[in-house]
A protein has these predicted regions:
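N-terminal intrinsically disordered/low-complexity leader segments
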Residues: 1-15
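Generic hydrophobic, amphipathic alpha-helix propensity
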Residues: 13-24, 41, 66-70, 74, ...
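Helix-turn-helix
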Residues: 19, 27-61, 65
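An amphipathic alpha-helix signature
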Residues: 21, 93, 97, 134, ...
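Short helix-capping/turn signature of helix-turn-helix
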Residues: 56, 114-120
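Hydrophobic alpha-helical connector segments
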Residues: 65, 79-105, 158-162, 188-191
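Amphipathic alpha-helical packing segments from all-alpha helical-bundle domains
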Residues: 72-79, 105, 121-147, 156-160, ...
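Hydrophobic/aromatic-rich alpha-helical bundle segments in the mid-to-C-terminal region
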Residues: 111, 115, 145-196, 205
């Protein structure tokens, strides 16, 4: 009986945690980090503020976890492209275009996760996840060097440039102040332009 109660308690605790993070993500996707206050998150999750603090020391910890979960999803997408049978050039084009288009499909969430002003702890997490994206892009570039599709002396710098292009290029279209609306066709066009640019920058001439 004690084991059963312990198991049920653990399950309930995990569910509470998931509910808190899911609520925080929903709030961020609708209004940004500025709207993701502990009280608001608790109300959205249907729990007390005190319960939120049982799982997280402060708001920044909640935001960092939401950021980590979101970027892990993007990394899985990029890594699946990296491990595919496509050529290095095709992998790079698809990885960049997919990342940009997914950002445009969730504009407020993407803007908040990448650009909205935050405290230093969340900014540090942003830096960490960009390093992970760079690692995947660097692998594609290395494959391209090996196949002769690319000729790059400094893979790390080239990967940084690609990550910079695929992330910062969406600052303007994602900025909530711009209130920009993109239809499906324009998202395809915009993401293709960025992917074309990145491939052209590194491919063998």
């Amino acid at each position: 009986m004690s084991y059963k109660r312990s198991s049920l308690m653990q399950e309930r605790m995990e569910q509470n945690r998931k509910s808190i993070l899911s609520s925080a993500r929903k709030i961020i996707s609708e209004g940004g980090f500025k709207d993701a206050q502990i009280q608001t998150i608790a109300e959205q999750a249907g729990v007390s503020s005190g319960l939120v603090y049982r799982y997280f020391d402060n708001k920044s910890q909640v935001l960092i976890e939401v950021l980590s979960d979101a970027i892990n999803t993007e990394l899985l997408v990029i890594e699946s492209i990296t491990e595919s049978d496509l050529s290095a050039k095709q992998k790079l084009h698809k990885a960049v275009a997919t990342f940009v288009k997914r950002a445009l499909n969730s504009p407020q969430l993407a803007y908040s996760l990448m650009f909205e002003p935050v405290d230093s702890t969340v900014e540090h997490e942003r830096f960490r996840v960009k390093q992970l994206i760079k690692k995947s892009i660097k692998k594609i570039l290395a494959d391209g060097n090996a196949s002769g599709e690319f000729i790059l002396d400094d893979l790390n710098t080239a990967a940084l440039c690609v990550v910079g292009a695929m992330t910062y290029v969406v600052v303007e279209p994602l900025d909530p102040a711009q209130n920009t609306k993109f239809d499906h066709a324009h998202k395809d066009y915009f993401s293709k332009q960025i992917a074309d640019f990145c491939v052209d920058a590194v491919q063998k001439k």
